[in-house]
């Protein structure tokens, strides 16, 4: 069996040396060459579009796939995990579902575009949870609205995981950047984030693009950030 680790932020993130991009994941899966695969997960989520791509790549894989949640599967990592043939969760692991979130700037029309994008993403994500658990869509989206955290036993009871493993307990850890988007994070995650190896630069530290005048030639496109992915509102994607 081929082992693949997703032990950091999903997406190619400068603030997390353990981050895993969709390209990284696809390369490792290709190297497995049809062999059974176990994806070991300890991730607070990240870039929703990388997670979607990773999920589709895993779903299309020809060999048998297992997702082993060993510390944390939160946000984008939670619905990515559900695309495996079997989802196994460690006895001390946590599972979390919530709504996608964004940082946006611009005019009123830009805010409406950002909100519309979030609504669409929320719908596609909730569909993944419904498919796995068999719960009603309204029930799933109510759980997402509340940012709901599940113990391993609760995750199995609600249908997010198929069974608990008998592995040794593993501490859940999440990057401080991912932690910013959590409203109801357990206390232990705060402590884990405090031990991060890097200081996270605030969004305000980014420098403007050269020649970016107010609405003039060379002006930077308006962007929104969805779970770590910066998108041009015209449809492009940038980090």
Model-derived features: positions:
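N-terminal organellar transit peptides
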Residues: 1-76, 83-239
């Amino acid at each position: 069996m081929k082992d693949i680790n997703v032990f950091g932020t999903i997406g190619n993130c400068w603030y997390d040396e353990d981050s895993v991009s969709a390209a990284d994941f696809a390369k490792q899966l290709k190297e497995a060459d049809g062999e059974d695969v176990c994806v070991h997960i300890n991730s607070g989520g990240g870039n929703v579009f990388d997670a979607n791509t990773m999920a589709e790549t895993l779903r299309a894989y020809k060999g048998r796939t297992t997702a082993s949640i060993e510390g944390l599967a939160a946000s984008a990592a939670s619905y990515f995990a559900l695309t495996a043939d079997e989802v196994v969760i460690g006895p001390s692991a946590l599972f979390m579902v919530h709504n996608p979130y964004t940082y946006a700037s611009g005019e009123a029309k830009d805010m409406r575009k950002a909100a519309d994008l979030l609504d669409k993403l929320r719908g596609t994500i909730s569909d993944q949870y419904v498919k796995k658990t068999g719960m009603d869509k309204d029930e799933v989206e109510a759980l997402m609205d509340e940012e709901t955290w599940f113990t391993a036993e609760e995750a199995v009871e609600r249908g997010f995981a198929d069974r608990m493993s008998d592995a040794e307990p593993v501490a859940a850890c999440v990057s401080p950047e991912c932690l910013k988007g959590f409203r109801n994070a357990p206390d232990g995650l705060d402590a884990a984030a405090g031990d991060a190896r890097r200081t996270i630069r605030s969004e305000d530290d980014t420098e403007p693009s050269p020649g970016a005048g107010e609405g003039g030639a060379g002006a930077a496109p308006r962007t929104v950030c969805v779970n770590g992915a910066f998108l041009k509102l015209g449809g492009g994607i940038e980090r």
